[in-house]
Amino acid sequence: YDSVTVGIDLTARDKQAEARANGNPWDIAKGFDNSAPIGKFIPLPEQTPKADNINFSLFINGVKVQQGNSQDMIFHIAYISQFYTLKIGDLIFTGTPAGVGPVKIGDHLEGYLEETKVLDFFVK
């Protein structure tokens, strides 16, 4: 692989709470339409050809709410590739850095890799 991006793994908390209250699995709260928007892919930085030290961040309405680094992944890409065949286009979500919170209709979300904006959308 030679490019990376950011993605957001959204959860419909109302659907999650309803499913939990009824003793049902809550995967519907994770798998709704448009529940995992991803940004545009950009080439890996020359200094991190293995994607193992890349800063990423999320802004909501201009306020930084999350930041992380790919080196903080519990399981790195090399480890994951022992169990799964990875091909160009496969997505690996790194986990959730501190700062998880609600979003609402009209919120403006922007995702960055280092200083490059790769994701930009409004919640509908």
Predicted regions located by residue number:
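Active-site glycine-centered loops adjacent to acidic/histidine catalytic or metal-binding residues
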Residues: 9
